[in-house]
Design a protein with these regions (language model features):
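Anionic-ligand binding patches
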Residues: 3-9, 15-196
C-alpha cells in the first residue's frame, strides 16, 4: 500500500529559517515539507504580538498555497530597550548584521545584570485560510557584549544563555533545537502533525 504524502508549506522565504525548521522537525513519515518560492511577496506584519503576526501569515499563505501552511513569527525582547526590537525584530535594521550592531550599540552602556532578554517564537498552522493550531514558546537569556559563534542566524550570535555561557550561535544544531524558543515550539508542532 502506497503512503499518501501530506504537504506542509513553510511560510517563509528566509533560507536560515527553512533549514532550522526542517532540521528541528526531522523526518516525519507521510509528510512533505516545502518552502515558499523565493520570489513570493511577503505580507505586511500588522499584528501587535508575535502570535498575531504568525496567524496573519499562516492564514494568507495557506490560501495562496492551497495547502496546510506553517507560519512563524519570532523575535527578541530586551528589557533595557523597553522591549525592542520586539515584533519589529526582522525590520530593526536593513540586514542581520546591521540589526545585531544596532542592538549592541543601544546596549553599549548597559551593565551586566541589566542585559536580560527573551527570545519568543510563535507558530501558527492554517488550512484554507483558517487557523487550526498555534503555540508560543520562549527562552530567557542576556545580550552578549559582542557576537560569538557561527551557527544559526538572526540575533543568535548575541543571545547568550547564561547557564551555558554560550550564545545560540555557539550551539550545535541538536542543542539549539532542544534549547531555542523555535526548537521548543517545533517539538510541539511535530507532536501535533504526527498525532493527526
Amino acid at each position: 500500500m502506497m503512503l499518501r504524502m501530506r504537504r506542509l508549506v513553510i511560510a517563509t522565504t528566509n533560507p536560515g529559517k527553512v533549514i532550522e525548521i526542517r532540521s528541528a522537525l526531522g523526518e516525519m513519515a507521510g509528510w512533505s515539507l516545502e518552502a515558499l518560492p523565493p520570489d513570493t511577496r511577503s505580507i505586511e506584519e500588522t499584528g501587535s504580538t508575535f502570535l498575531e503576526n504568525a496567524m496573519l501569515k499562516a492564514e494568507h499563505y495557506s490560501q495562496l498555497a492551497g495547502s496546510l501552511t506553517l507560519a512563524d513569527d519570532s523575535g527578541l525582547w530586551v528589557r533595557a530597550l523597553g522591549g525592542r526590537p520586539g515584533v519589529h525584530s526582522s525590520r530593526y535594521a536593513e540586514n542581520p548584521g546591521a540589526r545585531i550592531q544596532r542592538v549592541l550599540g543601544e546596549m553599549k552602556s548597559v551593565p551586566d545584570g541589566r542585559r536580560d532578554a527573551v527570545f519568543y517564537c510563535a507558530l501558527a498552522v492554517a488550512k484554507r485560510g483558517k487557523i487550526i493550531w498555534t503555540v508560543q514558546r520562549d527562552v530567557v537569556g542576556v545580550i552578549a557584549h559582542a557576537p560569538s559563534g557561527s551557527e544559526g542566524f538572526g540575533y543568535d550570535p548575541v543571545f547568550l544563555l547564561p547557564d551555558l555561557n554560550r550564545t545560540m550561535a555557539d550551539l550545535n544544531t541538536d542543542d539549539k533545537n532542544r534549547l531555542s524558543a523555535r526548537g521548543k515550539a517545533l517539538a510541539e508542532l511535530r507532536k501535533f502533525l504526527l498525532s493527526d
